[in-house]
């Protein structure tokens, strides 16, 4: 039973370890899911940033197109003004030159301004392109990270499934062992109760045997007393017979005391009858004592047979209990080997 309890405790420890490993795997799976959700959220935010950068890039390209169009329009206007200047040669030279210089300065300033804006837009465009490339690289890194997290999640799920399967097997084995333990405990309790009952029966049989021995001793003692009384009665009967003989001789010798002799004879006859009755009574009591002694001997023999049978049953029950223990050890060894 101690070995069974130790094995059950070991199996409970294994079950607790499997439960702890399953909880750890579940926690790792939850952490992996959390990391995957966080990575997906970061990917969504980066996607939004990329969308924003693309929108800004489109706006920048549109602004660049507008600026380029305006620059072309200014160039066309400048060329038209040059043509107009050639056509208006009748205007005074000083005024015309001043106007042209002023227009040229304004045009140059506007061109410089548009060039600066164009360069600024180019820089912003390059910056947006760089930002877009960085965002794409971050997205690629996040995608790789998500893939690694998904692989880690799959491995965690596999470990969780394996741990769950092992936990289920351990639970089933523990349940089967628990059922087997309960069955064996019930059998052991039944065997113990039966052994207690047999021990009680054996004690009762021994007590009855002791009582029978006591009764036998008492009967033997009474029988010895009866035999002694019988011997004394026989002696008294012999003495009575001797007295009768003497009285008869006295009766034959003494004729004068006939009445007294007759009275003595009657008394002797009465005493003889009494002795005979006592002898019959003693014989009856002797037969009864012998019958009781025989009954006591038969009772002792029956009780001895019952004691022998109970001892044989006890030996058989011990052997059966030993066989059950061996079967239990074999079953636990098979369970351990299966694991």
Swiss-Prot record:
Recorded GO cellular component terms are: actin filament; cytosol; investment cone; sarcomere
PROSITE patterns (UniProt xref): TROPOMYOSIN
Question: Keywords, A to Z?
Answer: Actin-binding, Coiled coil, Cytoplasm, Cytoskeleton, Muscle protein
Q: What superkingdom does the record give?
A: Eukaryota
Pfam families for the chain: Tropomyosin
Which molecular function GO terms apply here? Answer: actin binding; actin filament binding; protein kinase binding
Q: Which residues form a coiled coil?
A: 14-285
Disordered: annotated span: 160-179
**Record's keyword annotation contains Cytoplasm:** yes
Name which cysteines form disulfide bonds: none
Q: Supply one GO BP term.
A: muscle contraction
Keyword GTP-binding in the entry? The reply is no
Record's family? Belongs to the tropomyosin family.
* Alphabetical list of PANTHER family matching this protein: TROPOMYOSIN
Query: What job does this protein perform?
Result: Tropomyosin, in association with the troponin complex, plays a central role in the calcium dependent regulation of muscle contraction.
| Domain remark text | The molecule is in a coiled coil structure that is formed by 2 polypeptide chains. The sequence exhibits a prominent seven-residues periodicity.
Under the subunit heading, UniProt states: Homodimer. May interact with Unc-89 (via protein kinase domain 2).
Output this protein's name: Tropomyosin-1, isoforms 9A/A/B
Name the gene that codes for it. Tm1
């Amino acid at each position: 039973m101690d070995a069974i309890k130790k094995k059950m405790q070991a199996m409970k420890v294994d079950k607790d370890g499997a439960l702890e490993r399953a909880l750890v795997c579940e926690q790792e799976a939850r952490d992996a899911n959390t990391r995957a959700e966080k990575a997906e959220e970061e990917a969504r935010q980066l996607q939004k940033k990329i969308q924003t950068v693309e929108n800004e890039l489109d706006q920048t390209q549109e602004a660049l197109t507008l600026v380029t169009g305006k620059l072309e329009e200014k160039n066309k206007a400048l060329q038209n003004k040059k043509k107009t200047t050639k056509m208006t040669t009748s205007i005074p030279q000083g005024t015309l030159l001043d106007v042209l210089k002023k227009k040229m300065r304004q045009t140059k300033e506007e061109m410089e301004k548009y060039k600066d804006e164009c360069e600024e837009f180019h820089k912003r465009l390059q910056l947006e392109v760089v930002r877009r490339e960085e965002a794409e690289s971050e997205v690629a890194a996040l995608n790789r990270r998500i893939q690694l997290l998904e692989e880690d999640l799959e491995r965690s799920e596999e470990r969780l499934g394996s741990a769950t399967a092992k936990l289920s097997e351990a639970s089933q084995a523990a349940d089967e062992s628990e059922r087997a333990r309960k069955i064996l405990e019930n059998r052991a309790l039944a065997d113990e109760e039966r052994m207690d009952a047999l021990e009680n029966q054996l004690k009762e049989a021994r007590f009855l045997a002791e009582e029978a021995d006591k009764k036998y001793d008492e009967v033997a003692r009474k029988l010895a007393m009866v035999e002694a009384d019988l011997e004394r009665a026989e002696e008294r009967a012999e003495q009575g017979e001797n007295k009768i003989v003497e009285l008869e001789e006295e009766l034959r010798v003494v004729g004068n005391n006939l009445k007294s002799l007759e009275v003595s004879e009657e008394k002797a006859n009465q005493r003889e009858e009494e002795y005979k009755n006592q002898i019959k009574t003693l014989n009856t009591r002797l037969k009864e004592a012998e019958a009781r002694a025989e009954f006591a001997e038969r009772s002792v023999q029956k009780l001895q047979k019952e004691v022998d049978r109970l001892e044989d049953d006890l030996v058989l029950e011990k052997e059966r209990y030993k066989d059950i223990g061996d079967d239990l050890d074999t079953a636990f060894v098979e369970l351990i080997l299966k694991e």
